[in-house]
């Protein structure tokens, strides 16, 4: 990985970034996504490149993600959103490999199938309504440097699901027995039996740094409307209040005495796949760190870069006991996160991590451009 910095032209580089549009119109979509039912709770998604040039699409946190993530929204017959029981990961955007991308030639398609019963709590038989939408980071063909984004919005799929058959589908994350969970420090919520001495020290420091970042961000969200508008698309007083309140909640949770989440230093579920820094199970308010988490810096001074502190902060926003409704992964990185409409931005975990990171960075920061070439 190489870092390219521009010292003399900091102002020239920052200004265009702040001038990016705050919303991505649907008519800019180059991606068509069609959902169809192929079984009781099995879904097939056909993703088509409608453009005239090849698209290199990052699969992380999209309809193409191979991990048990939230690929579709699922609503029951009463219009209530069905509980999601899968994982919400934070991916390492500094070390992208070509394996994480899907390249589609013009008018070409790729299929991806998944069973929603593996990641959703299907309690009753009946009609369910599904849809998918989001932003996909894009790179040049054969490249891994993110250079753009593609919006997608699927058809609305209605399907009948038999709950008894859905119950037979193996869950992506089954409830663990207490002896498998391990020893939990009741003051902090850290599963100490999952940590060696070094990991425990690092996690406690990350929580302390997360608290510091969240408190600084809460103050900024209450007093800096232009900065809230930059990251959340609006400086309305209600938005500023909600953002500040959520940062205060994260600060309360980022403590060594009194956390409501369960925090694992390591993963005992085998879900730390390549590229995952850490992940959360919102259905159980549980956070798991992955090996790559410990290779990140403790607290970076590079604006919009990843580190242990903002990864912990990011994951805490995924927990319903911290933020309700819990934040999802709707857009990754500054460009995609600030391209979301306000209604999505305030529900996107990375907006909070990015906002908190900037508030802790020097005023005259060095922009970072990532290349894995």
Curated annotation (Swiss-Prot):
Highest taxon of the lineage: Eukaryota
Major location category of this protein: secreted
Disulphide bridges: 195-265, 272-290
Example of a GO cellular component annotation carried by this entry: extracellular region
Positions of the propeptide removed during maturation: 20-187
EC number: 3.4.24.39
Keywords for the protein's UniProt record, in alphabetical order: Cleavage on pair of basic residues, Disulfide bond, Hydrolase, Metal-binding, Metalloprotease, Protease, Secreted, Signal, Virulence, Zinc, Zymogen
Family annotation (PROSITE patterns): ZINC_PROTEASE (PS00142)
Signal peptide location: 1-19
A single BP term in Gene Ontology: proteolysis
Catalytic activity: Preferential cleavage of bonds with hydrophobic residues in P1'. Also 3-Asn-|-Gln-4 and 8-Gly-|-Ser-9 bonds in insulin B chain
Cofactor note: Binds 1 zinc ion per subunit.
Similarity-based family: Belongs to the peptidase M35 family.
Main function: Probable secreted metalloprotease that shows high activities on basic nuclear substrates such as histone and protamine. May be involved in virulence.
Designated name of the protein: Probable neutral protease 2 homolog MCYG_05201
């Amino acid at each position: 990985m190489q870092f390219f910095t521009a010292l003399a032209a900091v102002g020239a580089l920052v200004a265009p970034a702040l001038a990016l549009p705050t919303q991505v119109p649907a008519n800019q979509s180059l991606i068509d996504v069609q959902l169809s039912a192929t079984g009781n709770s099995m879904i097939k998604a056909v993703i088509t490149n409608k453009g005239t040039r090849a698209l290199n699409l990052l699969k992380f946190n999209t309809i193409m993600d191979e991990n048990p993530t939230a690929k579709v929204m699922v609503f029951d017959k009463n219009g209530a959103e069905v509980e999601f029981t899968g994982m919400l990961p934070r991916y390492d955007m500094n070390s992208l490999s070509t394996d994480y991308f899907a390249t589609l030639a013009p008018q070409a398609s790729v299929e991806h199938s998944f069973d929603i019963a593996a990641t959703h709590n299907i309690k009753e038989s009946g009609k369910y309504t599904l849809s998918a939408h989001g932003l996909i980071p894009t790179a040049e063909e054969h490249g891994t440097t993110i250079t753009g984004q593609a919006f997608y919005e699927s058809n609305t799929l209605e399907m009948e699901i038999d709950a008894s058959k859905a119950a037979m589908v193996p869950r992506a994350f089954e409830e663990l027995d207490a002896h498998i969970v391990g020893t939990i420090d009741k003051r902090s919520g850290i599963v100490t039996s999952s940590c060696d001495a070094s990991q425990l020290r690092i996690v406690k420091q990350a929580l302390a740094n997360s608290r510091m970042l969240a408190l600084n961000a809460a103050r900024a969200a209450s007093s800096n409307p232009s900065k809230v508008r930059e990251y959340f698309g609006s400086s309305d007083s209600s938005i500023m209040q909600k953002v500040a309140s959520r940062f205060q909640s994260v600060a309360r949770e980022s403590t060594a005495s009194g956390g409501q989440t369960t925090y694992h230093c390591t993963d005992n579920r085998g879900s730390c796949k390549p590229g995952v820094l850490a992940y959360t199970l919102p259905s159980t308010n549980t956070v798991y760190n992955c090996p790559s988490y410990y290779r990140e810096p403790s607290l970076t001074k590079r604006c919009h870069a990843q580190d242990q502190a903002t990864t912990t902060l990011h994951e805490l926003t995924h927990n319903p006991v911290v933020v309700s409704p819990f934040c999802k992964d709707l857009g990754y990185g500054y460009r995609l996160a600030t391209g979301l409409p306000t209604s999505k931005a305030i529900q996107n975990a990375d907006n909070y991590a990015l906002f908190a990171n900037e508030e802790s960075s020097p005023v005259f920061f060095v922009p970072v451009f990532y290349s894995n070439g």
